[in-house]
Amino acid sequence: MSTITIAWIALPFFVGFSIYLLPKLDRYLALVVAVASVAFGLQQVLNPISETFALLDNFGVTLIIDSLSGYLILTNALVTLAVILYCWGTGKSSFFYTQAIILHGSVNAVFICGDFISLYVALEVIGIAAFLLIAYPRTDRSIWVALRYLFVSNTAMLFYLIGAVLVYQTHHSFAFSGLQGAPTEAVALIFLGLLTKGGIFVSGLWLPLTHSEAETPVSAMLSGAVVNTGVFPLVRCALMVEDIGPMLQIFSIATAFLGVVYAIFERDTKRMLAASTISQLGFVLVAPAAAGMYALAHGLAKATLFLIAGNLPSRNFKQLQQNPIALPMWIGMAIASLSISGLPLLAGFGAKVSTIDLLGSWQKTAMKIAAVGTAIVFAKLIFLPIARPSEPSEPRKRKFGFWAAICLLLVSLVAASGLSLPGYTTANLIKSLATIAQGWLIYGFVFKRFALKLPRMPEQLEHLIGTMSLTLTLLFWMVLA
C-alpha cells in the first residue's frame, strides 16, 4: 500500500510538468490523474485502512491515511474531474491544466500530511497554484484579486510557520500530536494561520471576493476542494488533542452564523455561494468525527452550484427574477441546493444528521438554527422562475462538457447518500423536512421582500490583515483559558 500511495501522490506533479512537454495531451493527462484519485479515494472510503508512514525518520515527513483522508481525497478528485470535463471544449491552455493538476496534487498532499512542516510546504504550493489560476484571465481585476489572495495567504502562513517552529522547539518533532503540551503562543499562531487559510470566521472574509471573481471552473475548485485544506489540519488536530475541541466549536458556530448572515443578504449569486461556503465550513469543523462526510457533501454541491451560476444569464438576483431559467439548469441547481439544505436521499442529509448528532445540547441548538438559515439562503436559488417550454430562456448553448460535469456531480451527490444509511430514521426525516420548510417560509414571508446591504469594508485588504492581529489576541486568551 505504501508504494501505491507514494506513486499516487507523485503522479499529479509528474503529469503536471509533463503536460508542458506534451501540450496536445493536456486534457487527457489531467483526466487520467483525476480518475486515479477517484479510485484511490473511493478505495479509502469503502474499505478504510488506517496507516502511518514515516518517510525519512522520526523528525521527517509523516503521512497518515485513514477514512477522513479518503473522504477529502474523493471530494477533491470528483471536483477536479468535473472541472476538467467542464473545461474540455473551452480552449483552455496547457498552462491552465498544468496548474489545475498541480493544485489537485497539492490538495491531496495536505489530506495525508501528519506533520506541520510537510503541511506548510503543501499549503504554500497550493497558494501559488491557486494564485496562478485566479490570475489566469490576465485582466486587471483578476490579477488584483489573485495578488490579494496571495498576500493574505502568505501572511497567514508566516504566523503558522512561527508556531510550527515553536512546536518543534518544545517536542523536537513537527508531528500534529506535538500540539499537546505546546506553548500557548504556538497553538495560537498555528490556529491563526489555519483559520485564515480555511476561511473560518472573520479571518475568512477574504473568501467572498476571491471565489466570486475567479473564473467559473476555478471558483468550483476553490469552494469545492481547496478550502478544505485549511480546515482538515484543524479537524485532524482536534481528533488527536481533545483540549482544543471546545475552542474550535466556538469558532465553528460563529462561522456558521457569520456566513449565513452574509449569504442571506447578498444580491450576487457567486458572492452568495462564496459566503455560504464560509457558513458550511463551520458545519465541517464543528464535529470533527463527521467532518469527512460533510466536506464531501458540501464540496460536490458547491462545485455544482458554481458551475451552474457561471452559466446563468446574470449574477444579480433581481435580474434573475425577471429572466426565467431553463428547466434542466434549474433542476441541477435545485438538487445541489436541496442537498446543502439537508433533503433526504441526497448526501447533505446524512452529513447534517451525523454532524448534529455528535454535538452537545447548546451546540446542537445553535447549529439547528444555522441549518434553518442555510435553507433560507438556498431558497433564493430554488425559487427562481423557471422558463416554460413556450417561453424563451437564456439563449446560450451549453457544450457537452458542462452537462457531463453537472451529471457527474449530481450522480455523486445521490450515490454518496448511501454512505450514511443509519441516519435514515423517521425522527431525522421529519426534522430535516421541518428545517427546510421553516427556512422556505421565513424566506417567503420575510427575506424575499426585505433587502439589506451589508458593508464590504471588512473585506478590504488592510482590514483583513488587521483582523489577523485581533484574532491572534483572541486566540491567546482562549488558549490560556
Predicted features and spans:
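Transmembrane helix-loop-helix hairpins at membrane boundaries of multipass inner-membrane proteins
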Residues: 1-92, 97, 205, 476-481
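Alpha-helical transmembrane segments of polytopic membrane proteins
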Residues: 3-8, 68-74, 248-249, 364-369, ...
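Juxtamembrane membrane-water interface segments that cap and precede transmembrane helices
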Residues: 51-64, 204, 351-361, 420-426
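Hydrophobic transmembrane alpha-helices and their helix-loop junctions in integral membrane proteins
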Residues: 82-90, 94-98, 102-118, 129-389
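Cytoplasmic/organellar membrane-interface segments at the starts of transmembrane helices
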Residues: 315, 326-329, 384-481
